[in-house]
């Protein structure tokens, strides 16, 4: 028994020992495992925290900010653009951005279809496009339309209020507005929908005109809604863009555009036109025009003619190509981007260099037999007057615009000296590569300026071939920009100084401090004061001589005007008919003894269908004359009339209403007008035209004595190619009147244009302005 008991104890002890040892080991292992797991967990957490707080700090911070705040941009106002007198040419107008918040539409159970339908109708935006936006329920900002006018925004606001919509939003914005529409369009340029400059000065100086965007930052909840009990808002002011002041004078610009557009219509100009007005003493651009024009407020719209061609095309791709081509054409600034052969206007430059070199003087004489042989040419150079001008002085050679005389003058100057002056006048830059063609630009502060194209030095200097020198002497076989020509001619008449042209006078910040300031810059003196004075005297005779002056159609009574005509044949010709195409031009300056303004007009491809002879003298010269007639009085230049001019010039109708018939007749006769009386009364009760109207000298004023003027209308006749006197009398028979803007030199001049189209219905007493040109067939030529 004892042995059995003893044996049991022996069996139990090992049993207890064997159970206790595994428990301890398991506990230890568990503790170790927990420690390891803890270490691993903390390691992972530490790594994660390191990643979040250190490695990806910026990313998670941005995510947190995006969830906790809402940021609203405040659009900065773009700087205004002013003309030289402070008239606003470009400004900002208040508009709105209409957007939706799909997240709020979903949150507030608003009707997406209703919203899409109403906004589509009000804003003229595709319904499906808006409906698709509403499905982006994770988004808070989807723009439906930008630059919405206030009256349209009010309709959206009324819809939003009526339906109590939270998800439809209206945000204030600004858009660029041009008060004068198309005025100076090619200079000012325009901005896109994003308010970034896309063309003209708006593009070139975009960084100056653009302000700094402001911001409002507010606290929001996890749904992006403003938190009700958290007063947190940061406001960062926007900074307005800098203002720009131009040298452009809006009034001068208007006169340039008005008369250039009239010339395009009168002469059926096919390929646009350009005009530039410059202050010759400073180089400041007073006006710059390129036609066809466009409205800066609707710059993508093309002309009706171009739109018809686009609408007629059925292929969408070709329609798009036509639209792009039409837009690029109308946006192109012919005044500085197009090059052309200047023709006879360049004779001014040849004259100036020859006088400066002393190879000619006012006493020099030249003989023109109608042509002149030139070394290197098979055919002789012909003058526009095939019979020749015979013997002539230097002044007469310029008055006649004689090619033969200018070839002789060019040969006296010589090829190398000619190119030396061409460089000095800014037309080319001489290089060490004598075989390369030459070019140059004025460096004006406008984008898009093209460079000239001239023959290489080796070609031009060839001692066995004078053909290039001969042609260049009268402005052919090279191309320049209109801007280069007016800059060089200004140097010829301002005392000899080549000025750098510019259009930006200054750019000022909000404190009125100039951040950009431009002033007259003398590039170099090209000719002497004496040479310049002689050039002015000779060119005044080109306009002022009523017999020999080829520029006499630029004449304006009471003013001394100098200038030169130009007619150049275009290289391209009509393939089918072989018809020649021309660019006609005129450059004039006034007053001739002390020029305050130089004006260049260029008409690209006038039509022969008008019956007016195609030449600078018949088309461009009278256009410049009309511009001068308006601009010189505006500049404060006082006219001085000769007795002959007083006889021919337009008359201002006096007020004779209330006078006796006899007194009225006497008052009209005193100012060079006649009278026709209707009625049997003794007192004038009405008159046509009314007092203050300006009419042609010798016009018949209608006086009513106890009889009422007729309310009937008259049909405007076609006066083209009628003599001044015939046109005046034909209009008088209808109770209508003409005025000439004091451009008449003799009653035999003919009408080349009228400001009111034939067939227009007019009231009795209406005054129509006409353009007069010489009727002397011996003066008709391509000069």
Q: Which residues does each predicted region cover?
A:
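Extracytoplasmic
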Residues: 69, 74-77, 84, 92-95, ...
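Soluble non-cytosolic domains of exported or imported proteins
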Residues: 76, 106-113, 146-150, 195-199, ...
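Ligand-recognition elements built from short beta-strands and adjacent flexible loops
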Residues: 456, 518, 558, 562, ...
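Flexible glycine-/small-residue-rich
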Residues: 93, 100-102, 172, 189-192, ...
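Beta-lactam-recognizing serine transpeptidase/beta-lactamase-like catalytic domain environment
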Residues: 5-12, 90, 96, 223-235, ...
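Acidic/histidine-enriched alpha-helical segments
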Residues: 129-139, 175, 269-282, 367-371, ...
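Conserved helix-loop functional segments at active or binding sites
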Residues: 262-266, 324, 541-544, 633, ...
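Periplasmic/cell-envelope proteins involved in peptidoglycan metabolism and beta-lactam response
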Residues: 1-310, 339, 416-424, 556, ...
């Amino acid at each position: 028994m004892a042995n059995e008991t003893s044996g049991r104890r022996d069996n139990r002890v090992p049993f207890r020992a064997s159970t206790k040892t595994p428990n301890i080991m398991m506990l230890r292992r568990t503790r170790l495992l927990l420690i390891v797991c803890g270490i691993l967990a903390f390691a992972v957490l530490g790594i994660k925290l390191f990643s979040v707080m250190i490695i990806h700090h910026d990313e998670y911070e941005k995510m947190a900010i995006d969830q906790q705040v809402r940021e609203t941009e405040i659009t900065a106002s773009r700087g205004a653009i002013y003309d030289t007198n402070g008239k606003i040419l470009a400004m900002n107008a208040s508009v709105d951005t209409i957007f939706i918040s799909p997240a709020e539409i979903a949150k507030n159970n608003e009707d997406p279809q209703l919203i899409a339908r109403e906004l589509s109708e009000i804003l003229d935006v595709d319904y499906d496009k808006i409906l698709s936006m509403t499905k982006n329920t994770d988004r808070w900002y989807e723009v439906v339309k930008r630059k919405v006018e206030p009256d349209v925004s009010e309709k959206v606001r009324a819809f939003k209020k009526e339906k109590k919509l939270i998800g439809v939003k209206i945000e204030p914005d600004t858009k660029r507005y041009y008060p004068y529409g198309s005025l100076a369009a090619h200079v000012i340029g325009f901005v896109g929908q994003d308010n970034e400059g896309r063309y003209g000065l708006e593009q070139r100086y975009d960084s100056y005109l653009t302000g700094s965007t402001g911001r409002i930052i507010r606290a929001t909840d996890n749904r992006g809604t403003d938190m009700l009990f958290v007063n947190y808002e940061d406001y960062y002011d926007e900074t307005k863009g800098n203002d720009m002041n131009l040298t452009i004078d809006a009034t001068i610009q208007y006169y340039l555009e008005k008369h250039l557009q009239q010339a395009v219509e009168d002469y059926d100009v096919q390929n646009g036109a350009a005009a530039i007005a410059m202050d010759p003493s400073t180089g400041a651009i007073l006006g710059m025009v390129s036609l066809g024009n466009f409205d800066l407020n609707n710059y993508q719209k093309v002309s009706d003619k171009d739109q018809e061609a686009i609408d007629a095309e059925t292929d969408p791709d070709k329609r798009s190509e036509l639209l792009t081509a039409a837009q690029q054409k109308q946006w192109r600034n012919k005044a500085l981007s197009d090059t052309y052969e200047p023709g006879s206007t360049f004779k001014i430059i040849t004259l100036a260099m020859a006088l400066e070199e002393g190879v000619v003087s006012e006493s020099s004489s030249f003989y023109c037999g109608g042509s002149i042989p030139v070394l290197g040419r098979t055919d002789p150079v012909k003058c526009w007057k095939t019979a020749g001008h015979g013997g002539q002085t230097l002044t007469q050679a310029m008055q006649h615009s004689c090619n033969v005389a200018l070839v002789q003058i060019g040969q006296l100057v010589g090829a190398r000296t000619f190119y030396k002056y061409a460089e000095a006048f800014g037309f080319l830059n001489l290089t060490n590569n004598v075989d390369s063609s030459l070019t140059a630009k004025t460096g004006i502060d406008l984008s898009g300026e093209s460079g000239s194209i001239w023959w290489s030095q080796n070609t031009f200097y060839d001692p066995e071939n004078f053909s290039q020198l001969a042609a260049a002497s009268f402005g052919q076989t090279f191309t320049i920009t209109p801007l280069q020509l007016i800059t060089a001619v200004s140097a010829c008449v301002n005392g000899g100084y080549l000025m750098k042209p510019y259009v930006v006078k200054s750019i000022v910040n909000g404190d009125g401090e100039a951040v950009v300031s431009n002033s007259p810059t003398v590039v170099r003196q090209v000719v002497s004061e004496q040479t310049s004075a002689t050039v002015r005297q000779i060119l005044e005779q080109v306009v002022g001589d009523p017999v020999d002056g080829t520029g006499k159609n630029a004449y304006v009574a009471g003013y001394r005007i100098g200038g030169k005509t130009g007619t150049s044949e275009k290289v391209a010709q009509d393939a089918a008919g072989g018809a020649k195409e021309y660019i006609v031009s005129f450059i004039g300056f006034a007053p001739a003894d002390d020029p305050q303004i130089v004006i260049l007009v260029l008409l690209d491809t006038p039509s022969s269908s008008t019956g007016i002879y195609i030449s600078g003298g018949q088309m461009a010269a009278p256009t410049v004359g009309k511009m001068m007639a308006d601009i010189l009085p505006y500049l404060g230049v006082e006219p001085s009339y000769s007795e002959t001019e007083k006889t021919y010039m337009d008359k201002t109708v006096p007020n004779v209403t209330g006078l006796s018939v006899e007194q009225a007749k006497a008052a009209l006769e005193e100012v060079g007008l006649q009278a026709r009386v209707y009625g049997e009364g003794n007192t004038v009760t009405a008159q046509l035209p009314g007092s203050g109207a300006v009419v042609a000298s010798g016009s018949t004023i209608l006086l009513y004595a106890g009889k009422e003027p007729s309310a009937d209308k008259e049909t405007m006749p076609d006066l083209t190619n009628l003599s001044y006197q015939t046109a005046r009398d034909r209009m008088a028979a209808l109770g209508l009147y003409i005025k000439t803007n004091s451009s008449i030199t003799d009653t035999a001049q003919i009408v080349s244009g009228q400001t009111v189209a034939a067939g227009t219905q007019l009231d009795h007493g209406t005054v129509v302005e006409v353009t007069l040109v010489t009727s002397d067939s011996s003066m008709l030529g391509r000069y």
